[in-house]
Each structure stands twice: as C-alpha cells, then as structure tokens.
Amino acid sequence: MKASYSAYDFTKSRERIDEILKGADADYQNKDSIPSRDDLTFTNGFNVRCSALFVDIRGSKAINDKHTKPVLAKIYKTYISELVAIMRNHPKVNEISIEGDCVWGIFDTPYQIDIDDVFEVAYRISSLIDVLNIKLRKRNYSELTVGIGASYGSSLLIKSGYKGSGINEVVWLGTLVSEAAKLCGYGNKLWLITKSWFRMCFMTT
C-alpha cells in the first residue's frame, strides 16, 4: 500500500494502543459466514469459518535466473492475471492476495456446495497451468510448476493499520492461510487436504 511521510506522535500512539487493548472480548464474535467489511472497525473482529486456497510457483529462482526481466514480467503477468480471473469465478470469493509469485484467496463457504466449488477452482487452476505451459513452451520460455493447497477452518478477521491515515488492510489471523500454504508446499507431489476439509467433503450425510 502506498504511503507518505507523517510525523510520529508518541502521545497519540499511546492513546491508540490503549483504545485497542481496552476493547471488550465481546467485540470479537463467531460467524459461520464472512461478514461485510463495513462491519469491521479497529477495535473489533470476527472469528469466521471459511476456506483458503493457496497457489505458489515451484522453482521460481531458476526461472528468474534464466530469463531477462521483460520475459519474467510477461510470464508472471499472464500467470497472476489468469489465477485471479479463475478465483474470481467462485461466486463467494471474498479476498484475493498477491504476494510475489504466490496468489491466495479466501472464500465464504458456509455450505457444502461452496466448498465443492473451491475444489473446482483448484482443478481449473491446474488446467490453466497446462494451457499456459503450452504457450510458454512455444516461445522457449520456462514452463511453470505450481503447488496448490486448500484448507477449511476458522480465521480471525480484523481490520489492521493506522487509524485515520487511510493505511489499513483486512488481515486473516490464525492457521487457516498458513495451513493452505503448507499444503501448497507439497505441490506437484500429491494431493493433500486437511482433516476438517475431509470431514466436510466426504463424511457428511
């Protein structure tokens, strides 16, 4: 997020710290579905059940070492562009984040069919990489190998940043995203899903 200079005020800093720390535990509610971001303040939060999907390129250092910067830009732009497009196709996508060559999304999945649709997103991404690699191969560019990880569970949704500055972000705390990232680390080796997701998908009646 873009930022500009602002003098630090120690007194106001203490006031902001006290305002957050004195907040009541009741301000952090449990939700089965992701609430509106308009409901978030700097002093509340929501413990939400949802799904995370994490995609990351394997061996990106070798790709970076092989190609010129313009070629790298083309490879990454096409990869990221179409991952975002596919994730947005989920009817209940809530957030998409891009960090380097990693793209991850949060999905509101209160019902079984919503979770099934997240699996479909993963399948489409896998197919997309196959198509993209055909096009990269024709240009003698490095082909991409990616890991895909998915997790279902609880995440603490908060609004974090500097109050009044316009610099703030929605942050997803807890193990949900890191668990999806860990599963992504096994990418292109085998399919792995979390125990809670297995129960949701295969043990419901």
Predicted regions and their residues:
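Catalytic beta-strand-to-alpha-helix segment of the class III nucleotidyl cyclase homology domain
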Residues: Y111-T205
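N-terminal short leaders/motifs
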Residues: Y5, C50-A52, K135-N140
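Short, functional N-terminal and low-complexity linear motifs
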Residues: D27-N30, V48-L53, L72, H90-I96, ...
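Regulatory cytosolic signal-relay segments
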Residues: M1-N47
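A broad, low-specificity signal for short, low-complexity segments enriched in glycine/proline
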Residues: K2-I17, D65-H67, D108-Q112, T145, ...
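Catalytic NTP-binding/metal-coordinating core of nucleotidyl cyclase/transferase enzymes
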Residues: D38-D117
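Short charge-dense sequence patches
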Residues: G23-D39, T68-L83, I129-R137, Y152
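N-terminal start-of-chain detector that recognizes signal peptides
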Residues: L21-D27, G45-F46, Y76-T78, V118-Y123, ...
